[in-house]
Every structure is written in structure tokens, then in C-alpha cells.
Curated annotation (Swiss-Prot):
InterPro entries, A to Z: SecY, SecY/SEC61-alpha, SecY_CS, SecY_dom_sf
Keywords recorded for this protein, A-Z: Cell inner membrane, Cell membrane, Membrane, Protein transport, Translocation, Transmembrane, Transmembrane helix, Transport
Keyword Transmembrane helix among record annotations: yes
Role played: The central subunit of the protein translocation channel SecYEG. Consists of two halves formed by TMs 1-5 and 6-10. These two domains form a lateral gate at the front which open onto the bilayer between TMs 2 and 7, and are clamped together by SecE at the back. The channel is closed by both a pore ring composed of hydrophobic SecY resides and a short helix (helix 2A) on the extracellular side of the membrane which forms a plug. The plug probably moves laterally to allow the channel to open. The ring and the pore may move independently.
Source domain of life: Bacteria
Name of the protein: Protein translocase subunit SecY
NCBIfam families: 3a0501s007
Any single biological process term in GO: intracellular protein transmembrane transport
Protein's gene: secY
Oligomeric form and interacting partners: Component of the Sec protein translocase complex. Heterotrimer consisting of SecY, SecE and SecG subunits. The heterotrimers can form oligomers, although 1 heterotrimer is thought to be able to translocate proteins. Interacts with the ribosome. Interacts with SecDF, and other proteins may be involved. Interacts with SecA.
Species lineage: Bacteria, Pseudomonadati, Chlamydiota, Chlamydiia, Chlamydiales
Length: 457
């Protein structure tokens, strides 16, 4: 209640939240603007046929894009190219020590260089994906004539409808770049991580369809396995609560390392030592590993689906990487564990912490300062990270288990248990932390201003 009251009282916070809300609303507008020359209603009908035949990959892609994928709108690619580009750049950083040094010495300049690289890769990946998307739309048009307007198919160059290809590539790439820009603006001038908020908004927008699926299949007295009976509803509710509580515990959980301070001289006074603790987060990476792993698996699988009819080996790869398959689940778990460790290694710097502790005469009881402290922090963080990574992976594969156990629609299992819930809860918690941090800074500023005023008098 206090935070809510301060929201209405603090003008700057109110402006940030309204700015964020306005940009996120603009994102949703793009869901209803189809790519020129494509009939969105017929496209949705085609995708429903695919979902009926078990093509769960498109269901996952549609959830991530907030319904834009199935309607073939201008933002159908979503932020997946941007996330894939971020993964590529972060992996490149491991082999670019010069850029890593620049990041440490001048973080602003290093971030600008990384931002430019990420944008370049985003454009390249968006162009590739939109080309494949256009090719897939032409294949859809053979099944349901009218998905692509005939006027765009009349002009051909070497047998290729070049006007349709150029239009689709330009429009869809622009849509992805617009989402990327909106995400960056929210991160800079609004509240929360912009890209994560866009993904979370897309997931939340699927809630009405999830609720509709549950209501349509709800039959408490039925013995039919295709209906949702009382036991199935109870299991879904328990899984939802379990995922919610477990996600909060994983993201908020910390391992407290005891820290002691020796006697220090501040000015002319000798300050006695005291005790404190160093919090090491159980899941330092948050929901980043889940977003990265989902996007990375979605990229090759989507390409495989788009060109599967022309290549038998690509068709096999697409089938193997379909959400819910054994290979997909194994790759998903391994990627989540890998990205959890990878992101933690890039963001957590034990050598800096050990150096700062030594400067401030702080030490961990039983551990010498300097290198021994650094090694101890690395060892402890590795053990804690393993626990967090395994929990993330276990929750992320819940949709597959739910789908097999309860035979519910894939959109229901994805939303109520697993990846979608992890992302939404993680993004909400992160945004709340940023609001609290902003309020804390405001409180400190007001205290400092009061002290300065008293000093003048």
C-alpha cells in the first residue's frame, strides 16, 4: 500500500510507469496489423490445422509473439532475432578479451559497442527469418489459396514473386527493429527490462485463449480422458501454485556468506569491527537462461518447419526439436543449465568482490583475504548455481509432463506450468525490485537534501 501511495505522489515514478505502459500498448497494436498482402484470418485457420496435427512449435512461437505469429502480422517475428543476436554477441565476448577489458574500464563505451553489434546481428537474423517466413507463406497459399493476395504473386523475376518477398522482408524486419527500439527505450527511460516486459506481455495476452480452452473442456462429471474433470482441474491448480511459489523462491533465494570487519580508522576515529553477510543469489541469472534456451531452440526448429517440405533431413531435425519431444526436452534442460552458468560467469566477478573486501578490511571467517577469498566465492557460487539451474530446468519441462498426464491443450500447459510462468513471474519480480530501488534512491536523496539544509542553518 505504501508503494502504491508513493506511485501517485512521486511524479517521476508516475511518468516512468505511464511511459512504459504507453510503449507496451504500442507493441500490442502491432499484433493487429497484418503484413501487406497476407490474409490474417486464413493464416489463423491454417495454423489451427497445424496445431490439430501436433505442430506444437508454432504454438510456442505464437505465445512468445503474443498471437502475432499465427496472424502473420508485422511483429510476427517478435524479439526472437534480438535475443538470438544477444546470445551470439555474449558468446563472442568470451573470445574477445580486449572488449571485456573495455567493459571493465569504461562500461558505457563497452555497452555501446555491444549494443551496435547486437543490432547488426538482429538485422541479419530478422532478414533471414522473414525470408523463410515469406517462403512458408507461399507454401501455405498452396494449401489454402487466398492467404497471399494474387496481385503480389503476379510479378515474378526468375520465377520468384519478388515484390512479395521484398515487402515481407522489409515490413517484418522493421517490426522486429521497432520492438527492439521500444525495449531499449523502456530499459533506459521507463521501469523494468524492456525486452523481458515485451515477452511477458505477449505471454499474458494468451491468457484469454487459455481460459477459453479450459472452459471448453471443463466437464467435472465426465469420464472422458479428453475432458477436464475435477481431478484434472485440481492438478492444474496445484501445479500453478507450485510453479508460482517455487519460481519466487528460486529467484529470491540467497546463500548468506558471513563477513567480518576488522577495526577501521575513519578520519580520527577508530571504528570497531562488526559482522554482516554477503548474499549470493541461488539463481543469479534470473529468467535469462529460460528466455535464451527457448529462443535458441525455436530458431533452428522454426527454420526446419519452414523449409521441411524441400529437405528430408531438415524435416527430421524439425520433428526432433518439436516442443514436447524427448530430444527437445533434453536439449532444453542442458541449454538452461549452460546459460545459467554462462550468464552467472559473465555477471558475477568474485575477483572484484574479494578486492573490495580487502580494501574495506572485510574477511570471511576461516578464509584468508585475496585469492583464497576469490576461490571460495567461485566454489560456493558454482554449487549454488547448480541448484538454481536444476530447479529452473525442472520447472521449464513441466508443460511436457502436464501435456502427457492430463492431455490438455499445449497453450494451457505452456501457460500454467513451465516456461511462460517462469518468465512472467521473473519479469514481475524484477520490475518490482526496480520500483523499490527507485523509491529507495528517492528516500536517500531527500535525506541528503535535509542534511544540507540543516548544515546551512
Amino acid at each position: 500500500m505504501t508503494t502504491l501511495r508513493q506511485f501517485f505522489l512521486i511524479t517521476e515514478l508516475r511518468q516512468k510507469l505511464f511511459y512504459t505502459f504507453a510503449l507496451l500498448t504500442a507493441c500490442r497494436v502491432g499484433v493487429f496489423i497484418p503484413v501487406p498482402g497476407i490474409n490474417g484470418e486464413l493464416a489463423v485457420a491454417y495454423f489451427k490445422q497445424l496445431l490439430g496435427s501436433g505442430q506444437n512449435l508454432f504454438q510456442l512461437a505464437d505465445i512468445f509473439s503474443g498471437g502475432a505469429f499465427a496472424q502473420m502480422t508485422v511483429i510476427a517475428l517478435g524479439v526472437v532475432p534480438y535475443i538470438s543476436a544477444s546470445i551470439i554477441v555474449q558468446l563472442f565476448l568470451v573470445f574477445m578479451p580486449a572488449l571485456q577489458r573495455e567493459m571493465r574500464e569504461s562500461s558505457d563505451q563497452g555497452k555501446r559497442r555491444i549494443g551496435r553489434l547486437t543490432r547488426l546481428f538482429t538485422v541479419a537474423l530478422a532478414v533471414i527469418q522473414s525470408l523463410l517466413f515469406a517462403k512458408f507463406a507461399l507454401r501455405m497459399n498452396l494449401t489454402i489459396p487466398g492467404i497471399v493476395l494474387p496481385t503480389l504473386l503476379s510479378s515474378k523475376l526468375f520465377g520468384v514473386p519478388w515484390i512479395f518477398y521484398i515487402t515481407t522482408v522489409v515490413v517484418m524486419t522493421t517490426g522486429t527493429l521497432l520492438l527492439m527500439w521500444i525495449g531499449e527505450q523502456i530499459s533506459d527511460k521507463g521501469i523494468g527490462n524492456g525486452i523481458s516486459l515485451i515477452i511477458a506481455l505477449g505471454i499474458l495476452s494468451s491468457f484469454p485463449s487459455v481460459l477459453g480452452s479450459i472452459v471448453n473442456k471443463l466437464n467435472l462429471g465426465s469420464q472422458d480422458s479428453s475432458d477436464l474433470g475435477l481431478i484434472s482441474i485440481l492438478i492444474l491448480a496445484l501445479v500453478f501454485v507450485f510453479v508460482l511459489i517455487t519460481t519466487i523462491l528460486i529467484i529470491e533465494g540467497v546463500r548468506k556468506i558471513p563477513v567480518q570487519y576488522a577495526r577501521r580508522v575513519i578520519g580520527r576515529r577508530e571504528v570497531p569491527g562488526g559482522g554482516s553477510y554477503l548474499p549470493l543469489k541461488v539463481n543469479y541469472a534470473g529468467v535469462i537462461p529460460v528466455i535464451f534456451a527457448s529462443s535458441l531452440l525455436m530458431f533452428p526448429a522454426t527454420i526446419g518447419q519452414f523449409i521441411a517440405s524441400e529437405s528430408s533431413w531438415m524435416k527430421r531435425i524439425a520433428a526432433l526439436l518439436a516442443p514436447g519431444s524427448l530430444v527437445y526436452s533434453i536439449c532444453y534442460v542442458l541449454l538452461i543449465i549452460f546459460f545459467t552458468y554462462f550468464w552467472t560467469a559473465t555477471q558475477f566477478h568474485p575477483e572484484q568482490i574479494a578486492s573490495e573486501m580487502k580494501k574495506n578490511n572485510a574477511f570471511i571467517p576461516g578464509i584468508r583475504q585475496g585469492k583464497p577469498t576469490q576461490h571460495y566465492l567461485e566454489y560456493t557460487m558454482n554449487r549454488v548455481t547448480l541448484l538454481g539451474a536444476l530447479f529452473l530446468a525442472a520447472i521449464a519441462i513441466l508443460p511436457s509432463l502436464l501435456g502427457c498426464l492430463l492431455r490438455v491443450d499445449s497453450n494451457v500447459s505452456y501457460f500454467l506450468g513451465g516456461t511462460a510462468m517462469l518468465i512472467v513471474v521473473g519479469v514481475v519480480l524484477d520490475t518490482m525490485k526496480q520500483v523499490d530501488a527507485f523509491l529507495l534512491m528517492r528516500r536517500y536523496d531527500s535525506v541528503l537534501k535535509t542534511d544540507r539544509t540543516k548544515g546551512r542553518h
